């Protein structure tokens, strides 16, 4: 849900505010290496919303989403209006992981775990839920986990561990994997240049959910967001104009953000996109409600569907717009020049 045009000019500021991520891919430094296309040093990805099977007596009583800079919590309330328990399938899709072709983007993951890189936890009525991982490492549409593991490559297709492993590939192994579409081909003109992972890692966590009769069961899904972090400084006023519609910036807020930049101030920006899909296509449900925690009182929060009356409070409230399957939430923190 990122805005490529906006992010293009952000990175030219040259300020990277994010701490070193657990797992990341970055462009290697070097005086003779041309600058990568301008993109944020740390980009965002969306974790899928919970999806659940249907049953005649299953009602979605509500969905609440709580957002903090380091944690997102979805609370689903499922009511079984019947006299017998329901047993339905449920799943959460984790974000697709794929290397940046030009090494210009990086993603901060909560854990170096290919089956759960976002630290996902799920509870039902307060009891931890055990999920099963459906994992695919797809190259040219074919699951190549066997070939990847045979060459001792990690499944996460970027990061320091991956870079070290592909650098250790023999020329024959690299050529064999390239022929399968698993890694990039070697460049004969630059035989020492490292190859890159060319597969995507797709993970779905699934389970069977039992819902007792006549009760409402809360299911809580919690994880660490894969967020973008960057800076805005003097000269970036037009970039705020470019993003105003996507996050529904009001004129007075836009003016305040731009005024700081005109006065040689800066903004540290945390940019998070969340899924706002309803849990079932076949069960009516109201739109998810949103609450966004401000890490500090002087920060500005912006997103479409925000309740403007809560903008100055420690917790900003709102609801996902009717036509949105994702909501982009941006938190602006005042920063020195």
Which residues make up each language-model segment?
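Bacterial N-terminal signal peptides that target proteins for export
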Residues: 1-11
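Bacterial N-terminal signal peptides
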Residues: 9-19
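Lumenal/extracellular ectodomains and adaptor appendage modules
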Residues: 24-337
């Amino acid at each position: 849900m990122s805005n490529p045009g906006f992010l293009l000019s952000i990175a030219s500021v040259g300020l990277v505010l994010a701490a070193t991520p657990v797992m990341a891919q970055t462009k290697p430094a070097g005086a003779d290496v041309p600058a990568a296309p301008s993109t944020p040093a740390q980009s965002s990805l969306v974790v899928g919303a919970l999806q659940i099977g249907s049953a005649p007596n299953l009602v979605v009583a509500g969905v609440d989403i709580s957002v903090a800079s380091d944690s997102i919590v979805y609370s689903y309330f499922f009511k079984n209006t019947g006299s017998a328990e329901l047993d339905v399938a449920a799943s959460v899709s984790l974000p697709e992981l794929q290397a940046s072709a030009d090494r210009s983007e990086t993603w901060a993951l909560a854990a170096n775990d290919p089956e759960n890189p976002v630290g996902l936890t799920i509870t039902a009525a307060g009891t931890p839920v055990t999920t099963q991982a459906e994992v695919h490492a797809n190259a040219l549409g074919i699951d190549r986990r066997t070939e990847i593991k045979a060459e001792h490559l990690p499944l996460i297709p970027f990061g320091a561990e991956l870079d070290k492993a592909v650098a250790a590939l023999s020329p024959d192994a690299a050529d064999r994997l390239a022929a399968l579409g698993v890694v990039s081909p070697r460049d004969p003109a630059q035989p020492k240049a490292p190859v890159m992972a060319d597969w995507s890692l797709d993970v779905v966590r699934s389970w069977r959910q039992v819902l007792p009769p006549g009760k409402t069961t809360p299911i809580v899904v919690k994880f660490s967001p894969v967020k973008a972090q960057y800076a805005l400084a003097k000269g970036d006023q037009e970039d705020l104009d470019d993003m105003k519609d996507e996050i529904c910036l009001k004129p007075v807020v836009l003016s305040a953000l731009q005024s700081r930049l005109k006065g040689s101030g800066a903004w540290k920006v945390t940019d998070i996109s969340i899924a706002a899909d309803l849990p079932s296509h076949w069960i009516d449900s109201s739109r998810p409600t949103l609450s966004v925690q401000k890490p500090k009182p002087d920060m500005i929060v912006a997103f479409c569907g925000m309740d403007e009356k809560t903008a100055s409070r420690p917790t900003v409230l709102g609801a996902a717009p009717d036509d949105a399957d994702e909501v982009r939430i941006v938190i602006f923190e005042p920063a020195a020049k």
